[in-house]
């Protein structure tokens, strides 16, 4: 699949923009704070209905405006689709072929993207929240039911946490309601956990050989899911629910004392092992970056295996963060089969034939100039 054009209105520093793209490589060049990352973000938001940079949708709307809009034309193997996302203070509304979608979960997954930005290099050494977000965003693209369960889980979690804070003063009168929320949380949380196990099993199958290739056969990558309760992938749903229920009973008083939910998928984490050593703790910077790169390249292949089309790859200021060898491995892997967007302050020093016939887009203060580079 590839996006052939995009239109922006009142998005970040773009008042109005219409732009067409090549189906292979598009290089967006500009100094910092000129709008190149905003353009990249707009493509991501059009696909995912949320930003990878902020959870505050108001930041996506141009200063002093009431709404922002992103439109795009998506070309898939057997169809051409128009996508539209309208952002206002009231929230987001999505349209597919001019038809408004009742839920964003019906819209997400139509256009698949893989974002690789400098912050993704923190996937290994960053906080558990970074890794959970990685799971949620990638799983949501290929499993709409996961997004539904996640949204329901988050709603119940918010209600349960509010009740726990209330119970810090007087817990006895609210225990029945707490039990109701706990059972709802277990119901949705169990399904989330099962989907994460399945996804990571597939990701492991793709990421391990990719990592082996980048490390020239010297390293073996293993991905391990670390749930906040004592469950395993081999358990069936009823057993997982049972373990969750017992765990919630054991931490109930602590949760009331602290006013927050202490276990569940929102507290889980991932660990990465290279040659049986925890990369977060014992890995070199090079091993951590190889792991992050392997995961991103694995995402591309995993999405292809699920939807039978390659996703769109967004490389936001990340090439300069990789050494020449990893840079070449990345570009060799995607060459000719994945529509790719690259942002950079300069292409000087990036010698690769993938970029030789790229469409070059120069961004200066929210305006663009384009050229096809055939050098």
UniProtKB/Swiss-Prot annotation:
One term under GO cellular component: cytoplasm
Compartment(s): Cytoplasm
Annotated Pfam families: SMC_N
CDD domains with a match to the protein in the record: ABC_RecF
Keyword line: ATP-binding, Cytoplasm, DNA damage, DNA repair, DNA replication, DNA-binding, Nucleotide-binding, SOS response
Binding-site residues for ATP, renumbered to this chain: 30-37
GO BP terms in the entry: DNA replication; DNA synthesis involved in DNA repair; double-strand break repair; SOS response
Coarse class of the protein's main subcellular location: cytoplasm
Gene Ontology molecular function, alphabetical: ATP binding; single-stranded DNA binding
Coiled coil: none
Keyword Lipid metabolism: no
Function: The RecF protein is involved in DNA metabolism; it is required for DNA replication and normal SOS inducibility. RecF binds preferentially to single-stranded, linear DNA. It also seems to bind ATP.
Similarity-based family: Belongs to the RecF family.
Protein name: DNA replication and repair protein RecF
The species this protein was found in: Bacillus anthracis
